[in-house]
Amino acid sequence: MLVWLAEHLVKYYSGFNVFSYLTFRAIVSLLTALFISLWMGPRMIAHLQKLSFGQVVRNDGPESHFSKRGTPTMGGIMILTAIVISVLLWAYPSNPYVWCVLVVLVGYGIIGFVDDYRKVVRKDTKGLIARWKYFWMSVIALGVAFALYLAGKDTPATQLVVPFFKDVMPQLGLFYILLAYFVIVGTGNAVNLTDGLDGLAIMPTVFVAGGFALVAWATGNMNFASYLHIPYLRHAGELVIVCTAIVGAGLGFLWFNTYPAQVFMGDVGSLALGGALGIIAVLLRQEFLLVIMGGVFVVETLSVILQVGSFKLRGQRIFRMAPIHHHYELKGWPEPRVIVRFWIISLMLVLIGLATLKVR
């Protein structure tokens, strides 16, 4: 919005031209989202406490989690608010990629909100019925994927970028829709599963979003895209603004979510952020890169799949508890140790993922 306004005012004062620079808008997008999160935090926490919107803790979970019962949840609302406001202020409003991310972000946020509401207000520990949750997540993912396929059919926008190989970028055809669907829905659920300890999900999300900000900048720059042998996508540059907004909002939320947490993001935050990372990866044609950079989310999800599969097939569990972060808790690791070590692993994976862009 401000970019559009600046374009009309630049003829009166040349200083408004600074709004056309992507790097400037990326920085102020991050700062805007950060300050909104920091401003909303105390107010959101107080309001959630007043409404008695406290975390519901499973009785079969680690004993250390019982003290978390009643901690305000649904704090993801402040993350989403900060991201949406920042993006609307600093991104070009005509960019279709920006709107794709916002549709998934807000859509998944609404699904998460309904799930949280049923858990917190109606005291239903199961929340939104699983089949309805997946149904609406699928509707949003398939709708966006189909629209993107029609808009980018037989162009670089529907190619598959394979790491470590320079010119291996096959056209996916209709498989693009299927891949996009699984990436968006899968990442949404993966971040949701990871959100089990104070700050555990938000910091890897910040790292991955920061990594994608660099990838989006390169993908939207013809020279750098050619240099790195990745598809040049002219709309991709504005995703830098979205990614930095996620970074800023995430850091602002972490201020209140760090151990011991004053507020939890809830499904309204985790589903939305996961879905956003998924659609960003799809738009940038970097689904494989998401698997590498988001390795913490992948391992958390695989631990649940393996645990359930092993118990059904063999009657035995692989881990003491899944997702895997609970396994380490039950082994006696203090919660802060689990969190920080997962953060370190996440940062390493993001750096490795970025390195693969050059190793071709």
Curated annotation (Swiss-Prot):
Cofactor: Mg(2+)
Species this chain originates from: Escherichia coli (strain SMS-3-5 / SECEC)
Name of the featured protein: Phospho-N-acetylmuramoyl-pentapeptide-transferase
Topological domain spans for side Cytoplasmic: 47-71, 115-131, 189-198, 257-262, 309-337
Keyword vocabulary terms for this entry: Cell cycle, Cell division, Cell inner membrane, Cell membrane, Cell shape, Cell wall biogenesis/degradation, Magnesium, Membrane, Metal-binding, Peptidoglycan synthesis, Transferase, Transmembrane, Transmembrane helix
Primary site of residence: membrane
Entry's localization field: Cell inner membrane
NCBIfam families for the chain: mraY
Residue ranges annotated as Periplasmic topological domain: 1-25, 93, 153-167, 220-235, 284-287, 359-360
Family per similarity comment: Belongs to the glycosyltransferase 4 family. MraY subfamily.
